[in-house]
UniProtKB/Swiss-Prot annotation:
Record-stated family: Belongs to the universal ribosomal protein uS10 family.
Pfam families: Ribosomal_S10
Protein's UniProt name: Small ribosomal subunit protein uS10
Source organism, top-level taxon: Bacteria
InterPro entries (alphabetical): Ribosomal_uS10, Ribosomal_uS10_CS, Ribosomal_uS10_dom, Ribosomal_uS10_dom_sf
Function as written in the Swiss-Prot or TrEMBL entry: Involved in the binding of tRNA to the ribosomes.
Gene expressing this chain: rpsJ
One annotated GO molecular function: structural constituent of ribosome
Keywords in alphabetical order: Ribonucleoprotein, Ribosomal protein
Source organism: Chlorobium luteolum (strain DSM 273 / BCRC 81028 / 2530) (Pelodictyon luteolum)
Length: 103
């Protein structure tokens, strides 16, 4: 039984439509190279809430909350070829998407 190579790509952004769009674009590129692909798998959305005082001196009870959510997607590529890796390296992702690649 041969050992299978795996590449895991995690996409993270504050805009869910941007993550979905680029996940589909990565999948289209990988499908052209005949590699096996799983995904995009939606990972749990993390919500961050920050509470700040409205006034710098008085009114401790008067506060304002700011929140944002970070959306994540996971794409797994099984048995990638050198052509697959070359095509992934040529992709130019926007600045709003954070990419983490593990093999």
């Amino acid at each position: 039984m041969a050992v299978q190579q795996k590449i895991r790509i995690k996409l993270k952004s504050y805009d869910h439509s941007l993550v979905d769009k680029w996940a589909l674009r990565i999948i289209d590129v990988v499908k052209q190279t005949d590699a096996i692909i799983f995904g995009p798998i939606p990972l749990p959305t993390k919500s961050h809430v920050y509470t700040v005082n409205r006034s710098p001196h008085v009114d401790k009870k008067s506060r304002e909350q700011f929140s944002f959510a970070s959306h994540k997607r996971l794409i797994e590529i099984i048995n990638p070829t050198s052509r697959t890796i070359d095509m992934l390296m040529k992709l130019e992702l926007p600045s709003g998407v954070d990419v983490e690649i593990k093999s």
